[in-house]
Amino acid sequence: MKIALIAHDRKKTLMIKLATAYKHILEKHELYATGTTGMKVMEATGLPVHCFKSGPLGGDQQIGAMISEDNIDLVIFLRDPLSAQPHEPDVTALIRLSDVYEIPLATNIGSAEILLRGVEAGFADFREVIHEGDRRPLAF
């Protein structure tokens, strides 16, 4: 799976703790991240991470573009809901694209842990089925 990791500044330490705790799961997948988050995760865990630009400089949009091309399977976005973000429209667009393309999205540590444990248990294998067949968003 291709997993995107994004964290607002006040959540970066939490992302590092998450990546460290679930390194045994994350190491089996391709990781993508916005700039600073990706660098911090790499430094703390030694995991390879493809780093895009920092979120406010377009990194969120770069990950959004990957989602729209069906090149991301899961997004962990540890948001800081108590601080204003200068790139809030980009954040909203990324969340919207995750919904449009049926990409599992965690926006807090609780949902991130559940998604990662689900990946480990094989509960996200439906993404592999999508990659084998039609590349359009699911229609229910």
Curated annotation (Swiss-Prot):
GO terms for molecular function: methylglyoxal synthase activity. It catalyses: dihydroxyacetone phosphate = methylglyoxal + phosphate. InterPro entries: Methylgl_synth, Methylglyoxal_synth_AS, MGS-like_dom, MGS-like_dom_sf. Substrate binds at residues 8, 12, 34-37, 54-55, 87. Keywords: Lyase. Its EC number is 4.2.3.3. Residues 1-140 form the MGS-like domain. SMART domains: MGS. One of its GO terms (cellular component) is cytosol. Belongs to the methylglyoxal synthase family. Catalyzes the formation of methylglyoxal from dihydroxyacetone phosphate. This is Methylglyoxal synthase. It comes from Enterococcus faecalis (strain ATCC 700802 / V583).
